[in-house]
Amino acid sequence: MGGYRVGLGVDVHAFADPAEGRQLVLGGVRIPSERGLRGHSDADVLAHAVTDALLGAAGLEDIGHYFPDTDERFRDADSIWLLREARRIVGGGWEVVNVDAVVICERPRIREHREKMRENLAAALGVEASRVSVRGTTSERLGFTGRGEGIAAQAVCLLERAVGT
């Protein structure tokens, strides 16, 4: 069989209460917002979806297996660092061909932050930014994202077997 594998990653996080003082982080970018997302790490849904897509493409366990929310070492962890670690776990036997990701929320709009998100994700994966796509969409006011209760993200990662492996 060929040397390509694809993985799908999905993540969702609810907004935290403003009194918790959490910052909103998407793709490693701190985005001005009254509310951040609730989570054990920095709750970066975009980075988490990409991480799960990468791990899935390599046929490995999910993000929670490697970075469990029961482990205090990962409390408030930088999710771009988690992605970088997941890339290390996947190892050199696979090359990232591309990643396509979408953030699903009514607010905030991510357009002005997309390029920096792409750069952050690409750097963590060890590829040029042209191999990473980040888009935003709404759920047309349907479901928990439509009601402004949280943010979701989905990502697809294509891996190719590295030459000589």
UniProtKB/Swiss-Prot annotation:
Its EC number is 4.6.1.12. The record marks H40, T138 as: Transition state stabilizer. Homotrimer. It is an enzyme of class 4 (lyase). This is 2-C-methyl-D-erythritol 2,4-cyclodiphosphate synthase. The gene is ispF. Binds 1 divalent metal cation per subunit. Its cofactor is a divalent metal cation. It comes from Rubrobacter xylanophilus (strain DSM 9941 / JCM 11954 / NBRC 16129 / PRD-1).
